[in-house]
Amino acid sequence: TCEKLEYVYVGAEFNRKILKYGGIMIHSSAVEVDGKAYLFSAPCGTGKSTHTKQWQKYFGADQAIIINDDKPVLRRLEDGWYAYGTPFSGKTDENVNKKVKLQGICMLERGENRIRQIQPAEAIPLILQQTIRPKNEKYLGKMMEIMDQLLREVPVYRMQCDISEEAVKMSYEAMKG
């Protein structure tokens, strides 16, 4: 439909423009707890939204706020990295217009509950798969520059999990610092 085409076009243009401001959009679900943003990223259908919904169930919807359920922006300011809500929030249309200090990024997979922090070399291909990569070399170079700094400064985790309260507790305990 025309609406879907417009959404895709505007999203791609937004993604290019945000690079000029040191931001990147990552296909993920971002949830805020205690003033910190936790990002869960994975391919479509893995369970990002399901996992952050479990956070709301565990902490309460007033304590676990979905910042953006599909494409938040990550951007570095003087005092660190922040997750921003965007209007590009996928089929759930859950987003808020705010920025929240980024606590960590978690690459999600289905499996038995376990989590570990990973190094940038392991994180880069996983996160790159969840970005909109510009075709223009200048924009792609800028995106890679931002991604490099992000991965050097923000902890990234790899988690296998099921749909359980235990998975929420495990991810929160590992990522909260």
Please report, for each region that a protein language model flagged, where it lies by residue.
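Charged, amphipathic alpha-helical linker segments immediately N-terminal to NTP-binding catalytic cores
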Residues: 1-15, 173-177
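Short, intrinsically disordered, mixed-charge
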Residues: 11-20, 57
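Pre-Walker A adenine-sensing motif
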Residues: 17-33
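Glycine-rich, often acidic-flanked micro-motifs
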Residues: 28-29, 33-43, 57-177
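Conserved lysine of the Walker
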Residues: 48
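Post-Walker A alpha-helix
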Residues: 51-52
